[in-house]
From Swiss-Prot:
Record function comment: Catalyzes the sequential NAD-dependent oxidations of L-histidinol to L-histidinaldehyde and then to L-histidine.
Source organism per UniProt: Saccharolobus solfataricus (strain ATCC 35092 / DSM 1617 / JCM 11322 / P2) (Sulfolobus solfataricus)
Swiss-Prot/TrEMBL catalytic activity: L-histidinol + 2 NAD(+) + H2O = L-histidine + 2 NADH + 3 H(+)
The EC number(s) this enzyme carries: 1.1.1.23
Keywords: Amino-acid biosynthesis, Histidine biosynthesis, Metal-binding, NAD, Oxidoreductase, Zinc
One GO cellular component, as annotated: cytoplasm
Protein name: Histidinol dehydrogenase
Active site: 298 (proton acceptor), 299 (proton acceptor)
UniProt remark on cofactor binding: Binds 1 zinc ion per subunit.
The protein's required cofactors: Zn(2+)
Classification via InterPro entries: Ald_DH/histidinol_DH (IPR016161), Histidinol_DH_CS (IPR001692), Histidinol_DH_monofunct (IPR022695), Hstdl_DH (IPR012131)
């Protein structure tokens, strides 16, 4: 199904589930582990014997993993690690007018990673969140993910958890997992920040606990905007649109093109799909860029002749695929993260990197302050009514 005009809003309204999620959070806060056992049995239809996966349990599950999948995980791990190691910032120091100053970077000490699960498990999500956290030297990493129908940990997830060296894995999912990581229970450690994607209940829970714990963001359904000119292959464009539609019925997929023939050929390949695709004919590529920057999509593909030049004009996008690069490869092995901002949040932040797990601490050492700076600091303190601030400064340097 094709629409030739963009909707006013994208689907990301979790207000309808807020009352239910509030009750879940309150239950976990008051009943702790008992609530987690009850909710897992009620919502996931699984009875678990223990919340925290035992070390032997993880090893046993990991041993069941197909060797080809192990190799794929190992290969992806090295590529993602190389990308995030490139981003580690140095400590910086300098000075001006008698004052030494600088920034030192420190890791967040404890984080929680939520890994969704359903018909399939998503070990790539644990790689995407866990690798930058490890590169950032986070001391304690705790993972929560729904249990399998057998009440244990998915083999691929267990393998990645062992490879990353995470501290603990919890066999809990949904809003109750977010609440447990935010407030702690008898079995679940309380963390300082929670990252990872999830359904509307998970997002609502992250929103509700964000006053007591850091979060990476509130995310909606997957988004893809494609800007394509006459050099693009319709087959690739259509495949990429259909690929992102696999994420669910609410995915937001847009083709912006100034080429009538390309649009016609793409239409032929997607017109019978039940999924809604948006196709917009633009006057030129500059108009396409303007629309894309307003949308601020999670994924942006530039199927154009000079992709690097066009990329210089993009200011709002979670991740950009250049030329014939399929967005799907970013979901796995390209290097950039697949945990990306949606619903316009790319206007103010990007995907998960080491910067989500470190924080800058600024310092100053005042030695031989010049008279102008000294007088300025005392005058400003007095003007704002902080008289003793001024005296504290003056006592040392006047």
């Amino acid at each position: 199904m094709i629409s030739y005009s963009l909707p006013n809003e994208r689907p990301n309204d979790f207000s309808r589930v807020i009352p239910v999620v509030k009750d879940i959070i309150e239950s976990v806060k008051t009943k702790g582990d008992n609530a987690l056992y009850e909710l897992t049995e009620k919502l996931d239809k699984v009875k678990i014997d223990n919340i925290k996966a035992r070390e032997e349990e993880l090893k046993t599950q990991a041993s069941k993993l197909d060797p080809k999948v192990k190799q794929a995980i190992d290969t992806a791990y090295e590529q993602l690690k190389a990308f995030h190691e490139m981003l580690v910032p140095p400590n910086i120091g300098g000075g001006y007018q008698g004052i030494s100053f600088g920034v030192i970077w420190r890791s967040i000490e404890k984080i929680g990673i939520y890994v969704p699960s359903g018909k399939y498990s998503y070990p790539s999500t644990l790689l995407m969140a866990g690798i930058p956290a490890k590169v950032a030297k986070v001391k304690e990493i705790y993972v929560a993910s729904p249990p399998t129908q057998e009440g244990t940990v998915n083999p691929a997830l267990a393998y990645v958890a062992i490879k990353l060296g995470v501290n603990e894995v919890y066999k809990i999912g949904g809003a109750q997992a977010i609440a447990a990581l935010a407030f702690g229970t008898e079995s679940v450690k309380k963390v300082y920040k929670i990252v990872g994607p999830g359904n509307v209940y998970v997002q609502a829970a992250k929103y509700l606990v964000s006053s007591v714990v850091g979060i990476d963001g509130i995310e909606g359904p997957t988004e893809l905007v494609i800007i394509a000119d006459e050099t693009a292959k319709a087959e690739y464009v259509a495949l990429d649109m259909k690929a992102q539609a696999e994420h669910g019925p609410d995915t937001y997929i847009v083709l912006l093109s100034n080429d009538d023939e390309l649009i016609r050929r793409v239409e032929e390949k997607i017109k019978n799909d039940k999924k809604i695709y948006y196709i917009i004919k633009t006057k030129n590529l500059d108009e396409a860029i303007e629309i894309a920057n307003k949308i601020a999509p999670e994924h942006l593909s530039l199927y154009v002749k000079d992709a690097y030049t066009l990329m210089d004009k993009i200011v709002n996008a979670g991740a950009i695929s250049l030329g014939n690069t399929p967005p799907a490869i970013i979901d796995y092995v390209a290097g950039p993260n697949h945990i990306l901002p949606t619903n316009g949040w790319a206007k103010i932040r990007g995907g998960i990197t080491v910067y989500d797990f470190i924080k800058p601490t600024m310092y100053a050492n005042v030695r031989d302050i010049n008279k102008q700076l000294l007088e300025a600091s005392i005058s400003l303190a007095n003007y704002e009514g902080f008289i003793i601030h001024g005296k504290s400064i003056g006592a040392r340097y006047e």
